[in-house]
Amino acid sequence: MGEKIEISTINKRKLLVLDLDETLIHTAYSPLSSGCLIAQQGYFYLYERPYLKEFLDRCSTEYDFAIWSASKADYVRWIIRSTVLSEFAFVFVNTRKNCKRVFAKDGRVEYIKNLSPYITQYEKVIMLDDVPKMVIPIGCCIKAPEFRGGADDFLLNVSC
């Protein structure tokens, strides 16, 4: 996980970098009253955002995919194995160790996802994330509404 690549090495296709938590999936410590439970591991209940497979199928005609999550590697591997993400190839999978750790004004730890070292052509890269302020450069991020496990049609309507 976390190999550096140049976008120009990806068959001249565009790159769609995907965040996981609250963008494509939601995990909860107890079962939710709505939503489609995909998997359970220990105290984690995993919910996949509706229309994820349709979105990825639609985007795969023009984009290569990568994952960048501020979560730990074992958790990210579990998410990929447990969801439709396992059916797709990824140019890279970055986790918390690839993020820059910063402290917010209130003392909370936040993790910045800096795409700059990974790309040479910014116009060919888009990131989908629910917290675009944590992505550098900011201009390449599409904000996804926070997903909390229930009914949702964002991925059905967002264009690639």
Predicted regions and their residues:
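Core residues of folded domains in eukaryotic genome-function proteins
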Residues: 12-25, 55, 61-64, 89, ...
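Substrate-recognition element of Asp-dependent hydrolases with the DxDx(T/V) motif
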Residues: 52-80, 96
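Amphipathic alpha-helical protein-protein interaction segments
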Residues: 11, 18, 41-52, 65-69, ...
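Short interface patches used for recognition in eukaryotic signaling and trafficking proteins
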Residues: 6-9, 37-46, 60-65, 144
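Eukaryotic intrinsically disordered and solvent-exposed regulatory patches
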Residues: 2-5, 9-12, 49-54, 110-115, ...
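C-terminal cap/substrate-recognition subdomain and adjoining C-terminal extension
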Residues: 74-160
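Metal-dependent phosphoesterase signature
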Residues: 25-49
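Non-catalytic pre-domain segments flanking phosphatase-related domains
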Residues: 1-20, 29-34
